[in-house]
Amino acid sequence: MRRGRQASGRPFPKRGIQLIKVTAMSEEKQTKDKTAGKDHYPVLPLRDIVVFPYMIVPLFVGREKSINALEEVMRADKHILLAAQKNAGDDDPATDAIYQVGTLASVLQLLKLPDGTVKVLVEGTARARVLRYTDNANYFEAEVERIPETIGTKTEIEALARSAVSQFENYVKLNKKISPEVLGTVAQIEDYSKLADTIASHLAVKIADKQDVLETTVVSDRLEKVYTLMESEISVLQVERKIRSRVKRQMEKTQREYYLNEQMKAIQRELGEQDDSRDELNELE
């Protein structure tokens, strides 16, 4: 059995693939899914990634059960629950090894690759909780309920949102892996829930920390957690930058000393050769 691979920023390949289906979920089906309190959905366990609502992300999938789940989603034109594994190294996780809270997502595109794996483009739509897993040998399937969220007090959440955006700006300056364009996009988000989720999705933190953010249903609390995570990461990044700067200075100093030593040796060799020439002339005289 192949080990499923997960999210990557690479674009969809154009050659050597089989396009299984390109789909936009019907409006009728979307409405039904959004209004349903409880329903049964296929579950896709994820390694090393937590998908948040509003995220559009490509996933590589290789495990048989996961591929079966995606095929069922495409056949039935429904959502799928994306839930992170507690242990990314587990090739065949049990249901209790998968987090109960995940993100319902629609499948935008699915491609079958030559090596038998599948690349799928998904879009997170809502938080959801697994109530119980159903007996399905072909793929993980569970009874799922959507998780309602509360905003918090208006004054507090506005202050938290401003602080989070400002802190994210500091984080982006230190983390060169995030493009400046992302900051511009984040600064324009007016929905507080989306703001917290979008920032969290860009943070290089542990899966357990992102899962904690996903499971936080009070938006003001979620923004506060995201802010705290950024504060911690910024402290680490600042220390890393100081270390890199110190190492760079030491390397430059070592290189300068090496260059001066080599230059001195060359001068000494040159002077030695000149002394030898003088001795030879003196002997000839």
Task: Locate each region found by the language model.
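N-terminal low-complexity, acidic/polar interaction/targeting segments
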Residues: 17-285
